[in-house]
Amino acid sequence: MEFTDVFYNLENEKQFLAEIDELLTIPYEKNELEIGVSKFLSFINKYGEPYLITEFQLQRCMEKFLNSPLYQLDENAVLSIFYDCFFFLKEQQTLKFIIIVFQSEIQENEYCLRLLASTGFIPVLIKAMKQFKDRSENVAFTSFRYALFLVYYICRSRRLSPTDLVAIDEYFLVNLFKTSEEAWNDEDMDSFGMCVLTLLSINEQFMLVRLASKGSFEIANGIMDLLSSSKVDNGIYSEGLVFTLNREKDPRSRMLILKQLFLLFTTPATYEIFYTNDLNVLIDIFIREINNIPDELSDLRYAYLQVLIPLLENTQVRHPPHYKTKCIVDAVNNVLISHSKSSNMEDARTTDVAIRVLEVPWLQQEMKSLGTAQ
């Protein structure tokens, strides 16, 4: 697709928006769609910078576009044109606009999701994101957050190919950790949460590819490699995981956090990256959730119990003075009582993991002292 060069003499934002409206309402036939999209993107690229600075301005322009006759003539065809453009365009202004459209449509448009989830898009998106990571540049960082959402949404929708995963390199991950640290320090919880969810989704992808490979090939888990080293502040990340788990309601997001915690608590280099106070808060969360999770979320209850074992065995909570031992034992015993008489396979699995929690050596000693040994 070739961009067309048309000169406009714009003096203010009102004129810019008027030209946008005019471009988007030009009548086209379906076979002329690419011409209309080309004219629009060319205009955005050449004249957008003074008038597409804030998130509000970007959102307003996007809404005009999505509600326009040009887009509604054939939404999927326009998305395909945007997708093709994304692979060869280098102009930041145009890339930012395409990203915000994708971010809006991927949640509602199944075709958009299939398009972006195809192998090859993630590497190009990661490359574009490296231009937008500066939090001091508001519009660039807004585009970075939208692109992060795309990575997160694609990761939660399908298993990434090895080619896609390799593109998520150390440089990108280090900067994503640093961005999350800056957001945490600035108390920007929305940006921090998006960074953490994306890191958790990428971590899950590394876990999936390892399971699928069965030793035939090896792709190192870049998240765990960084957390095991001194290249990122794992203290902020671990504190943020506790913060997020304590407030998160979405079962899928909680499961992502639990998968990350399981890896951290079963990898010797990361056994003790959590502060003891944060571990105590984690124990409070686990007690609360094990007691309160409804039966329809039995997989989530099982995950909490499964992660509780290495938490008790490998982290510094294994050393006295132990925190809320009786509450831990009572919560696990409640699970055993409610599941022990069931013949359901899921209940049997939950019972097995609950018994394994109570077999943690120091917990057994504490139970004897409390007179509650099984």
Swiss-Prot record:
It is found in: Cytoplasm; Nucleus; Cell tip. One of its GO terms (biological process) is actin cortical patch localization. Keywords: Cytoplasm, Nucleus. Its main location: cytoplasm. GO terms for cellular component: actin cortical patch; cell division site; cell tip; mating projection tip; nucleus. GO terms for molecular function: Arp2/3 complex binding. InterPro entries: SPIN90/Ldb17, SPIN90/Ldb17_LRD. The keyword Nucleus applies. It comes from the Eukaryota. The keyword Nucleus applies. It holds the Pfam family SPIN90_LRD. Belongs to the LDB17 family. May be involved in protein-linked oligosaccharide phosphorylation. This is Protein dip1. It comes from Schizosaccharomyces pombe (strain 972 / ATCC 24843) (Fission yeast).
